Swiss-Prot record:
GO biological-process terms attached to the record: in utero embryonic development; mRNA processing; negative regulation of DNA-templated transcription; negative regulation of transcription by RNA polymerase II; RNA splicing
GO CC, one annotated term: centrosome
Name under which the protein is recorded: Corepressor interacting with RBPJ 1
Primary role: May modulate splice site selection during alternative splicing of pre-mRNAs. Regulates transcription and acts as corepressor for RBPJ. Recruits RBPJ to the Sin3-histone deacetylase complex (HDAC). Required for RBPJ-mediated repression of transcription.
Domain of life: Eukaryota
Self-association state and partner proteins as the record states: Interacts with RP9, SNW1, SFRS1, SFRS2,U2AF1, RBPJ, SAP30, HDAC2 NKAP and NEK6. Interacts with Epstein-Barr virus RPMS1. Component of the histone deacetylase complex. Component of the Notch corepressor complex. Interacts with NKAPL.
Organism (species): Homo sapiens (Human)
PANTHER family listed in its UniProt record: CBF1 INTERACTING COREPRESSOR CIR, COREPRESSOR INTERACTING WITH RBPJ 1
Basic and acidic residues bias locations: 78-93, 305-324, 331-358, 367-387, 411-440
Annotated region (Interaction with RP9), positions in chain: 204-232
Region annotation (Interaction with RBPJ) ranges: 1-121
GO molecular function ontology, one term from the record: transcription corepressor activity
Position of sequence motif Nuclear localization signal: 235-245, 291-298
Length: 450
């Protein structure tokens, strides 16, 4: 589907793009170029002959003068044909074996670069590195040296015509042909001509230790084995002791670190727990020291340990007594402060009441005092109740109710209420500036606020 017209026409015999016509054109071009080369060679030969003839005439050769030189010289094309035959006889190397007896056209006889494609034969234009033959690679099983290293391949007998299989020469040929080995194979500072690359056979030299062991008898060998076993056991014991000592050290360090971390956490949580933990740690340390001393001096150290314990118990008791006395002193200091504060509050109350009484006695006569006291007490009770109710309500509603009640009252009561409010204001003003002296010599400022 969809093939072009050119693809259809190139299959015709008369079309110039057909394969047969292209081949014919190429063959004709090759013949023309071959003929041109022959003519050029003949012209060069003729020029050389003319030069040699002229030189002989100058030298004075008699044969040239007589004109008999042509009798002793071969025809112009005979020398070249003989040389080509000698070269072809000497050259036995072919890329492939089937090329030795295969017929070839004249223009392709001398040119080895032309690749032949015979019918029914697989042609691989590849050369082996090991055997240097065409048609396979060193990894193919066709190669006669397959599976052999360079050193082993060099030892294999050959006809002598092939190249040597030494690794240094193989590496050089690989480089010339464009291949190269990795550095991991040769090494960084290794070269192909390095003597370490050559195979060196062992000369049968033995170590002095092996000779000494061979010279010993069976009994001496048994003794040596026993000694070696003992030394190995001693080494193992030493290693075990070292490991145990290291483990005990690591455990001791871990215990210390855990105790220090626990003490730091307790101190951060509360000061009381830190004190108790520090005391317990100190007690533990002291007990450890005492145990060590007891182990060292079991017989002589009993009395000393008892005296030390007594001294420590005395020190603890003194410490507890000092802490309790300090606590009692702080309580005793706090009590008078509280009493002074309460007494100052009571004095302020008494001074306020006295100032109210004095202001009322100065302003009013003794006849009106009884009536005013009764009215004041009743009014104070009413005010307290109103203030309690007004706290829960809004201030706007409270003011409106007071104005309505004032309008309902009598004018005589309003005048008496105004007089009471004036007298009360003066009493407040005086009460704010009054001072009272206490027996201790301290002055307290009395203030009254409603």
């Amino acid at each position: 589907m969809g093939k072009s017209f050119a693809n259809f026409m190139c299959k015709k015999d008369f079309h110039p793009a057909s394969k047969s016509n292209i081949k014919k054109v190429w063959m004709a071009e090759q013949k023309i170029s071959y003929d041109k080369k022959k003519q050029e060679e003949l012209m060069q030969q003729y020029l050389k002959e003319q030069e040699s003839y002229d030189n002989r005439l100058l030298m004075g050769d008699e044969r040239v003068k007589n004109g008999l030189n042509f009798m002793y010289e071969a025809p112009p094309g005979a020398k070249k044909e003989n040389k080509e035959k000698e070269e072809t006889e000497g050259e036995t190397e072919y890329k492939f074996e089937w090329q030795k007896g295969a017929p070839r056209e004249k223009y392709a006889k001398d040119d080895m670069n032309i690749r032949d494609q015979p019918f029914g034969i697989q042609v691989r234009n590849v050369r082996c590195i090991k055997c240097h033959k065409w048609g396979h690679v060193n990894t193919d099983r066709e190669c006669p040296l397959f599976g052999l290293s360079g050193i082993n391949a060099s030892s294999v007998p050959t006809d002598g015509s092939g190249p040597s299989m030494h690794p240094s020469e193989l590496i050089a040929e690989m480089r010339n042909s464009g291949f190269a080995l990795k550095r991991n194979v040769l090494g960084r500072n290794l070269t192909a001509n390095d003597p370490s690359q050559e195979y060196v056979a062992s000369e049968g030299e033995e170590d002095p230790e092996v000779e000494f062991l061979k010279s010993l008898t069976t009994k001496q060998k048994q003794k040596l084995l026993r000694k070696l076993d003992r030394l190995e056991k001693k080494k193992k014991k030493k290693d075990r002791k070292k490991k145990k000592f290291q483990k005990s050290r690591s455990k001791h360090k871990k215990h210390k670190s855990s105790s220090s971390s626990s003490s730091s956490s307790s101190s951060s949580s509360s000061t009381e727990t830190s004190e108790s933990s520090s005391e317990s740690e100190s007690n533990n340390k002291e007990k450890k020291i005492q145990r060590k001393k007891r182990k060292k001096n079991k017989c002589s150290g009993h009395n000393n340990s008892d005296s030390e314990e007594k001294d420590k118990s005395k020190k603890r008791k003194l410490h507890e007594e000092l802490s309790s006395s300090h606590h009692n002193r702080e309580k005793a200091k706090e009590k008078p402060r509280f009493l002074k504060h309460e007494s100052s509050r009571e004095d302020s109350k008494w001074s306020h009441s006295d100032s109210d009484k004095k202001s009322r006695t100065h302003k009013h006569s003794p006849e009106k005092r009884g009536s005013e006291r009764k009215e004041g007490s009743s009014r104070s009770h009413g005010r307290e109740e109103r203030s309690r109710r007004s706290r829960s309500r809004s201030p706007g509603s409270y003011k409106q109710r007071e104005t309505r009640k004032r309008a309902q009252r009598n004018p005589g009561e309003e005048q008496s209420r105004r007089n009471d409010s004036r007298s009360h204001g003066t009493d407040l003003y005086r009460g704010e500036k009054m001072y009272r002296e206490h027996p201790g010599g301290t002055h307290t400022k009395v203030t009254q606020r409603e």
